[in-house]
Amino acid sequence: MTDFLRDDIRFLGRILGEVIAEQEGQEVYELVEQARLTSFDIAKGNAEMDSLVQVFDGITPAKATPIARAFSHFALLANLAEDLHDEELREQALDAGDTPPDSTLDATWLKLNEGNVGAEAVADVLRNAEVAPVLTAHPTETRRRTVFDAQKWITTHMRERHALQSAEPTARTQSKLDEIEKNIRRRITILWQTALIRVARPRIEDEIEVGLRYYKLSLLEEIPRINRDVAVELRERFGEDVPLKPVVKPGSWIGGDHDGNPYVTAGTVEYSTRRAAETVLKYYARQLHSLEHELSLSDRMNEVTPQLLELADAGHNDVPSRVDEPYRRAVHGVRGRILATTAELIGEDAVEGVWFKVFTPYASPEEFLNDALTIDHSLRESNDVLIADDRLSVLISAIESFGFNLYSLDLRQNSESYEDVLTELFERAQVTANYRELSEEEKLEVLLKELRSPRPLIPHGSDEYSEVTDRELGIFRTASEAVKKFGPRMVPHCIISMASSVTDVLEPMVLLKEFGLIAANGDNPRGTVDVIPLFETIEDLRAGAGILGELWKIDLYRNYLLQRDNVQEVMLGYSDSNKDGGYFSANWALYDAELQLVELCRSAGVKLRLFHGRGGTVGRGGGPSYDAILAQPKGAVQGSVRITEQGEIISAKYGNPETARRNLEALVSATLEASLLDVSELTDHQRAYDIMSEISELSLKKYTSLVHEDQGFIDYFTQSTPLQEIGSLNIGSRPSSRKQTSSVEDLRAIPWVLSWSQSRVMLPGWFGVGTALEQWIGEGEQATQRIAELQTLNESWPFFTSVLDNMAQVMSKAELRLAKLYADLIPDREVAERVYSVIHEEYFLTKKMFCVITGSDDLLDDNPLLARSVQRRYPYLLPLNVIQVEMMRRYRKGDQSEQVSRNIQLTMNGLSTALRNSG
């Protein structure tokens, strides 16, 4: 840790401590300090965990609340200081002229140069380029805007403090530092007196607003900037023939993901699409208002194009002071039309005033873009390139990036639900009596007949369906209305989770056809929506390529693909595959599935686009996005990658413009490098694949023996983690299980991983790997040879390196001494001790095998920055865990008072903040 960062954390911690003493009293402050110092002693090995348990022995729920809040705030401020420090280190490296680090565009340009990548290859990749971060909801990401605002202001004041500390001191330096400290104290006081989390269970609408907040915080500005910068750079390096298309195209699941969530309805689809459009239209209006003030250029000073004059004359801005200012008059008219568009699409209440009513709304984003390009062209013709390259160029890039939709809203539902809906529709329409009971061949015949027929299934005005079917139909109906209003980019994807057959993929196409998103035309249907199978269990991942191969033999579907640019998108589920088969088996099943899909697409002449359903944690496919994309098989990226972003990962990546820029750059850099360069140094691919397959089977066997076969495991899991509390408290809008059952299979991936991370076991991110590696390596001379093989793979193959590195990262955040406290909550002591012993033994075996393969002495030897980060936040985590265990004990004994419930939520959110990737 650098002196600056240590100083910042101590500085912010001191102020927080003083605020706590002032607001809560000396007794609370002293208990916080005692817990903090004890935690540091434990971290240094100078005390046992029991000493912290003793600190909180007998603590009342009322006294526990400010302690939980204190350590949650410590974690929040430590994150803030760390982010600022990382940002400043990068700035210093740039100032020093250091070699650009990996995951930056500057580094990517150098690599493309060194790799002698030609313009034709770049152009080919960019024609279908799409880098799509897709924001999804998460139960612990419930921070309020007030908290974000406070963080933003504290960061601003800390930057001011650093600038003063780095500058030559003057007579006023100390007084300025005192003023900054006063401002920070004020903000921390406001933060302390603000509720960190909402009282009520968040509604879908609340989660939509949280997602939109990141656009206002960073993405509205940074996505257009990075798209503009990439386009300009590639044109300069590779020539005018390189297509200028926006690369980053954001998406969202919030409001459209109805898989297992009955609260997603037609109303949430309408709300999500309308609020997205309103957000981007108001952004355009603000930018145009600023441009109108900035572009004071007089036509007495320079010439303008006839097209610009025509636009100015249509601007209805004939005040005398602007008679010689055609740009202002032109922009005024464009702004009027955008406001008129907002009033038409969103409603007149969304726009202040009436002056815009003389203007005609834009019919499309393309019409708006043409007007902006008219202004741009005129500026460039008169040698005002510097002016054109500023705000106007960002606005043009924004229009190309966002249209009138801002993001693309995905619809997602599981295959079983689609089958249920069609069973009811087909029965009512007298197509077939019981579709669900038909064979696969019979279902296929029914579906193809319906897809070829323009006849609607639903009689006009009919509403006599079951509640579930009516809700599903309402979602598709509203999606169709949103597309008509905001354009085809508003809802361009329909995802089928748990897809395991050809008919699973075709079923939602019937519903899309019913509401006009697909038009029947014999074997040549036309549509604006990609139908995307999601393969997520180990079995389905293995079968995925075979399913697509059969699907592509159907002329109707193959022709539909052709009019969708011949692109087949496939979503890969990291979460359920991990829950199904464990960390290593899931990772290999995903990689192997990609190998098969790449080969299938190559032989069939179909373009592949992969959508990676990654969570925040390693157990759900998390880890650095840059490394994850580079770890894909050759041919799996091809300029396009979609990837889910959620929870604390969203706030960590996109909570401010600097981190947003960095993370968007990482996605684009990795996509370009994976598409255009050979990043793997494997010499014998088949041998590497055979090794992974063998280790995967051994890992699956170990994982299955505990998670799916041990009779006591379900009791251990449900009773030693906060799973019950996640289900019963107001944490997230989505139920924690798909069905009312206690099986691991039906449990949702987020509560599965979130529960293990809260109890500090982190089991989904490593269990089974140690045994698998030890058994595969064996003993004696064979062991020496096989260790060498694995060491070579770790040095030469990004996939294997990424698997090990991500595992080490998550294991470094585990703390089995705390896990033992959670295990003590289990009434059946035999189950508790037996399962804990299995977990404990496997953890240390996995750590040992990791060190053998990597040649390390500890988990994070190769990542000192992350190691220091984990060490810094460790002491803030311990008190939160100990308090959580005590509150869970009370809750389960019947004390389900608001104070106890609130403390459990506080500790869950505090731990999520400190861990930064909880579920």
Curated annotation (Swiss-Prot):
Question: Would you name any one GO CC term?
Answer: cytosol
Cross-referenced Gene3D superfamilies = Phosphoenolpyruvate/pyruvate domain
Fetch the Pfam families from UniProt. Answer: PEPcase (PF00311)
Q: What SUPFAM superfamilies does the annotation carry?
A: Phosphoenolpyruvate/pyruvate domain
Which is a GO BP term held by this UniProt record? carbon fixation
Q: Which UniProt keywords apply?
A: Carbon dioxide fixation, Lyase, Magnesium
Q: Which cofactor does it need?
A: Mg(2+)
The source's superkingdom equals: Bacteria
Q: Known EC number(s)?
A: 4.1.1.31
Report which reactions are catalysed by this protein.
oxaloacetate + phosphate = phosphoenolpyruvate + hydrogencarbonate
Against InterPro entries, the record matches this protein to: PEP_COase, PEP_COase_bac/pln-type, PEP_COase_Lys_AS, PEPCASE_His_AS, Pyrv/PenolPyrv_kinase-like_dom
GO MF terms held by the record: magnesium ion binding; phosphoenolpyruvate carboxylase activity
Q: Which residues are the active-site ones? A: H138, K579
Family membership, please give it: Belongs to the PEPCase type 1 family.
Q: What's this chain's function?
A: Forms oxaloacetate, a four-carbon dicarboxylic acid source for the tricarboxylic acid cycle.
Name of this protein: Phosphoenolpyruvate carboxylase
Lineage here is: Bacteria, Bacillati, Actinomycetota, Actinomycetes, Mycobacteriales
Q: Which gene encodes it?
A: ppc
